Amino acid sequence: LRGKHEIVGKILEHRGLKKLLGTYIDALPLLINKETGKIHTSFNQTVTATGRLSSSNPNLQNIPIRNEDGKEIRKAFIPDDGCEFFSADYSQIELRIMAHLSGDANMIEAFKEGDDIHAATAAKVYKISIDKVTREQRSKAKTANFGIIYGISVFGLAERMNVDRKEAKELIDGYFETYPQIKEYMDKSIDLARGQGYIETIFGRKRYLPDINSRNSVVRDRTSTRLNS
């Protein structure tokens, strides 16, 4: 409904601000350790179904950054004098793992050539040279890259990109035309999960899926366990 009436955008904005207020602005000061004057999170090793670390009290893995209001929350975290915060992240690790697991020749070639994978995806989907890719096209390709490998639906992609469903469907179709072995791998993963009742990571961790045969689309997301474990 976003875009069809101005009140919808206002409601969504209100929800976002209410989330920031309740989860961060009001809650974070209450979690400051009185002795150290700092916030100390807890990292959990055996809580998530995928095997990934999670964080609680507070969840420091989920401090907002996607919009300007969220970025203001991050400004509340200040290092000690003489110290700095830094972050390290693998470059597009989920896509690299997907390229390895699926053996998709086009994606592997893009990584081997050192291409910007999002620009390379946009170039192939929109059938233009990589130097002609616009910022908007790259942004859409980035959203598609990370959404599609986790089983995002046409509706979900349309909502995330704020486009109509026709454009979202064309993007997904173009994506799988560009990376056909990824589509094949994803379909095989779902079939395998339905047959054995679980998904197994590269390192042998099993995630059992008792509702794998339901019609719920969340099944598509759960079969992505191999990517994010």
Where are the language model's segments positioned?
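Conserved catalytic core of nucleotide polymerization and phosphodiester-bond processing enzymes
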Residues: 1-229
